[in-house]
Amino acid sequence: MRLNLCFLLALLPLWHSTAANAAINVGATRVIYDGANNETNLTVSNREDTSPYLVQSWVSRFGSSNQDSVEEFIVTPPLFRLDANKENILRIIFMGGKDVPQDRESLYLMNVKAIPAMSDDQKDKNVLQIALKTSIKLFYRPAGLKGSLKEAVAQVGWRAQTGTLAFNNASRLHVVISQLKLNGQLVPNAPEVLRPGEAGQLPVPAKAGDTLSLSYIDDYGSVVAAPVVHID
């Protein structure tokens, strides 16, 4: 991003740039949507002392190149002005959908894009406005889905398979990995998320009896160390 921006500014020396850096704060690192509820909320605040922002919000699919809004959720208000030192509450409403499974968790992205307003002295100039987007995970848990995230982590199976490390998430929840170690060594290219029912192999030489330690991110955004296991 920095290289691209520097290149762009080198081509446009008369332009100025402004960015919605840390001024716009999203009040959570993830959203857990309980399907038993009609909606869930997310707070967005503007920490700037003077500058307002135009804020756009929507839900998209996790892991997809298409980041357009999905039909399963609506966010209100989808577009609004957020003045300095103010906050607004986004209402996230599940609209349903035939492709949303009711026997396991589904994962989406909650997106918040902030565009800074022009100051009075910028209005008569060529100004490059930079919109920054924050995306956090949104987990939809159908009503009545049983089991905790701690139990889900315990249901992830690990075993040595022909010189690789095989895994199988037998739970109905997503397991977000913070760190994965085999015999005390970091596993390179470990998956970010183990989806419900997902199985696969990691190109790591493993053998039965090796120790595996997993740290995962819980519903509150905290990193939790799971008990060390010996792989089969």
Located regions from the model:
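Short, solvent-exposed loop/turn segments enriched in Ser/Thr/Gly
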Residues: 36-41, 103-107, 161
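N-terminal signal peptide c-region/cleavage motif recognized by signal peptidases
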Residues: 15-19
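Intrinsically disordered, low-complexity Pro/Gly/Ser/Thr-rich segments with frequent PxxP/GP/PP motifs
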Residues: 65-98, 185-211
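Short acidic, flexible loop segments centered on an aromatic residue
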Residues: 48-66, 170-187
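Terminal connector regions
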Residues: 96-145, 210-232
